[in-house]
Amino acid sequence: HEKTAEMEKGMRTGKKLTAEILSGKWDEALKSFIWITQRYSSRKTLCKAVASYCEIFGEMPVEIYSAPGRSEVGGNHTDHQHGRVLAASVSLDAIAVAGRVDEPLVRIQSEGYKLCEIRLDELDKKTREEGTTKGLIRGVLAGLKQQGYKMGGFCAYITSDVLSGSGLSSSATFETLIGTVVSGLYNHAEIPAVTIAQTGRYAENVYFGKPSGLMDQMACAIGGMVYIDFENEEKPQVEKIDADFEKAGLTLCIVDTKGSHAGLTHEYAQIPVEMKQIAAHFGKNVLREVEEKDFYAELPVLCKESGDRAVLRAIHFFAEDERVVKEVNALRAGDWNRFLKLVKESGDSSYKYLQNVYVSHDTVSEPVAIALAVSERALADKGVCRVHGGGFAGTIQAFVKEAAVLDYKNAMEAVFGADSCHVLKIRRYGGIRVIG
């Protein structure tokens, strides 16, 4: 992954780093990142994080790292079927203040959570840690160690504005951040972004116990707008797409519907399970290996064999996988109207066929559906909206024409509360050492 151009050799103590930040020494370096938002326009966030680190772990040499949230733009639930996706890292992020220690112990304090301590000679999976932050940390450390990367003890204080369970992939952000810290502290910041992403997915699947594709981690680790083809999942094809949304007069908005993904792992997990059932009918492992014409030829049999929902979800996959290619071509051609039309089609397909807008047995709580309805009314011809990420709860995505952003934000916050509509930028960088 990329290193900061402004990086200087030699770690600074917390006290020295705070003084440098307050003096403005790092202002130009920070401004050079396209992703710096209001969180960084004040130096308070970084200084507060450094102060919290020193309060918990003591005064010692430290560095600052960052990993972004991500927004999937196209390819809703295609990655776990070895399909294609279009995703972007966004200007919400998690930052870590981290410093090396001599003992083989990793201690991580996330703001608002309990301190996690993991010994580096005890990296085997612990079943009781499934679904926990500690499980994710242990998984990332184990995965990197298994691949032969240098490992050592460190302390880290983490603060994040990537909402948990919100469809911005807070878990992938966290995994990327831990991998980036290990890379920076012990491996000369030379662990490839793709390796950090694959290790994060390993941690999530094996140690955390949640089935997921690789899209979230790839978008967080690599950064920018990325087109990823997972046909060969061990060596995914990754291409950065140069798309200037600001120049096109479009703004990415993420609306937090205040419904969390927490407790919805089963609903989320059923999607790959059902898609793989359809693939298994053809003797294949995933839908990417199945010919679409063969699928449609067997439709009546598949409906009886796997049920209508599984078939509808496969219908979504085939159309969505092709749609990603069309979206990429539209962006390359600068055809923004075509791109927006395809984004809307993606959302419609997720709603009708993938069926990940609400939980079928919970008719009382359908906040994503409400958000989409309110969005369509508020936007009219001034933008498009869709469910993104895992779905079922959390957030929706909207691409809004610049002149309509304030009205859209007001309309959404009238329903979901103050600060529920996040106006974002696409961040150029993935996991990165900011100061070190």
What are the roles of these predicted feature ranges?
Residues 141-164:
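Glycine- and acidic-rich phosphate- and metal-coordinating loops
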Residues 107-109, 153-160, 190-202, 340-345, ...:
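Beta-strand segments within the central parallel beta-sheet cores of soluble alpha/beta enzyme folds
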Residues 146-154, 182-196, 402-415:
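Phosphate-handling active-site elements
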Residues 188-237, 241, 346, 372-375, ...:
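Alpha/beta catalytic cores of group-transfer enzymes, especially the acyltransferase/condensing modules
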Residues 3-70, 95-130, 227-386, 398-436:
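C-terminal nucleotide
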Residues 82-102, 222:
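Structural signature of FAD isoalloxazine-binding scaffolds in flavoprotein oxidoreductases
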Residues 89-91, 168-188, 397-400:
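DPxDG-like acidic metal-binding loop motif
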